[in-house]
């Protein structure tokens, strides 16, 4: 992958200071160079920021006092704050996180062998997928780098402080929260770079996953920027159904989307040659055995594993959750074709933290112009 510098939209705070959470390592080194310091100082500060979740320059004991004073004058480390916490009976935690005067939601999902953090990339979403609660709230804006990586930072700080209670440290990050990550590449990519950086959170590229509904030009662009695990929100075995439930399919149909996925796989080491297919199970919409046969035929040339996701309801939604028996029959058809097929266990649905339930603030649904502009950015690659 090419080492392409991605410039954040805006890295200064209201008081004119640089928020260091907005900078990846290359940018951090440039920042310290401008201060007249050696590049290794950037590495030292990043280690304090991400290995120890430190946001106080005075606590960085291997930084000399003069430099600490200089940093306090021109920079800060400001992660978004948690304004509400909900805990599920299954151990899942959902945090409402303040980003300016709005909120996004971040979900911590502990399991026996890992702990996954589901991170948001936008306030709301422009894509209007019919089965997703986030999409029904409309689109407001992109999150900055500091607001994306800040979700990981804040969660890591909370979990780190709670080690005595047995909470597992974050081992995986999935860009599957609110928003379409590929419509915010300029901020999502630097945030993921920090997740992967040894002086950042040091995660393996196989443990950072980006999920997309199919913004094809941006997916091609992503392949030249960074290598992470890829999950695609397919949800339908044919264009007729997908046009209805995932409207971006009218711009980039399934064939076009899967071709872009295969191009990404050719460049990627993180995916080990196959992609994760996400398929939400909607009762008598896309969950029949005939749909399973169609899906198997559709994916025969795309190396993949398939996650079947029981749909999680929200008020006013026109769908129902597929029965366990229908999901089981669907899964067995796919496995008969040789596909690795997993029925995802629903986590956090009692606190509306499950897949498709994140909403954050309710946003004025009349903001159609903003949503159409964002959909236009999916077409104009210069705007993505």
Curated annotation (Swiss-Prot):
The Radical SAM core domain, residue ranges: 111-350
State the deletion phenotype. Cells lacking this gene lack nucleoside m2A in both rRNA and tRNAs. Inactivation of rlmN produces an error-prone phenotype since it increases the misreading of a UAG stop codon, and thus decreases translational accuracy. Also leads to increased susceptibility to tiamulin, hygromycin A and sparsomycin.
What name goes with this protein? Dual-specificity RNA methyltransferase RlmN
Q: What gene does this protein come from?
A: rlmN
Q: Which cofactor does it need?
A: [4Fe-4S] cluster
The record's subcellular locations are:
Cytoplasm
Query: To which protein family does this belong?
Result: Belongs to the radical SAM superfamily. RlmN family.
Keyword DNA repair on this protein?
no
Q: What is its EC number?
A: 2.1.1.192
Q: How is the cofactor bound?
A: Binds 1 [4Fe-4S] cluster. The cluster is coordinated with 3 cysteines and an exchangeable S-adenosyl-L-methionine.
Top enzyme class:
transferase
* Active site residues per record: 105, 355
Q: What else is known?
A: Reaction proceeds by a ping-pong mechanism involving intermediate methylation of a conserved cysteine residue. In details, the methyl group from one SAM molecule is initially transferred to Cys-355 in a typical SN2 displacement. Then a 5'-dA radical formed from a second molecule of SAM abstracts a hydrogen from the methyl group of mCys-355, and the resulting Cys-appended methyl radical attacks the substrate adenine ring.
Q: Which InterPro entries does the record match to this protein?
A: Aldolase_TIM, Methyltransferase_A, RlmN_N, RNA_MTrfase_RlmN, rRNA_lsu_MTrfase_RlmN/Cfr, rSAM
Per the record, the GO terms for biological process are: response to antibiotic; rRNA base methylation; tRNA methylation
- Please tell me the species this chain comes from: Escherichia coli (strain K12)
What cellular-component terms does GO give this entry?
Answer: cytosol
């Amino acid at each position: 992958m090419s080492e392409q510098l991605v410039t954040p939209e805006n890295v200064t705070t209201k008081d004119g200071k640089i928020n260091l959470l907005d900078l990846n390592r290359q940018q951090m080194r440039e920042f310290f160079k401008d201060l007249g310091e050696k590049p290794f100082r950037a590495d030292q500060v990043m280690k304090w920021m991400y290995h120890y979740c430190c946001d106080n320059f005075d606590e960085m004991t291997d930084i000399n006092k003069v430099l600490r004073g200089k940093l306090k004058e021109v920079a800060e480390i400001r992660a978004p704050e948690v304004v509400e916490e909900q805990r599920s009976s299954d151990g899942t935690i959902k945090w409402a996180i303040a980003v300016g005067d709005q909120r996004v939601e971040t979900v911590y999902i502990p399991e026996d062998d890992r702990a996954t953090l589901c991170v948001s990339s936008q306030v709301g979403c422009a894509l209007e997928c019919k089965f997703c609660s986030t999409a029904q709230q409309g689109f407001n804006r992109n999150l900055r780098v500091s607001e994306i990586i800040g979700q990981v930072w804040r969660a890591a700080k909370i979990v780190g402080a709670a080690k005595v209670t047995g909470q597992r440290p974050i081992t995986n990050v999935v860009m599957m929260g609110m928003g379409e990550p590929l419509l915010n590449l300029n901020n999502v990519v630097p945030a993921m770079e920090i997740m992967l950086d040894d002086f950042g959170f040091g995660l393996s590229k196989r443990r950072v996953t980006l999920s997309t509904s199919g913004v094809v030009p941006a997916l091609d662009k992503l392949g030249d920027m960074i290598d992470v695990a890829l999950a695609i929100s397919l949800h339908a075995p044919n264009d007729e159904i997908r046009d209805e439930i995932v409207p971006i399919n009218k711009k980039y149909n399934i064939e076009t989307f899967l071709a872009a996925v295969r191009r990404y796989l050719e460049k990627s080491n993180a995916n080990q040659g196959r992609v994760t297919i996400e398929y939400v199970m909607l009762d008598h919409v896309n969950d029949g055995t005939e749909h399973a046969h169609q899906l198997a035929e559709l994916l025969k040339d795309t190396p993949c594993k398939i996650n079947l996701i029981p749909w999680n309801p929200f008020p006013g939604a026109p769908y129902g959750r597929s029965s366990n028996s229908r999901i089981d029959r669907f899964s067995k058809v796919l496995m008969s074709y040789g596909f690795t097929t997993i029925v995802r266990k629903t986590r956090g649905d009692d606190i509306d933290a499950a897949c498709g339930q994140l909403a954050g603030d309710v946003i004025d649904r009349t903001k159609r112009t903003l949503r159409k502009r964002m959909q236009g950015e999916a077409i104009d690659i210069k705007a993505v």
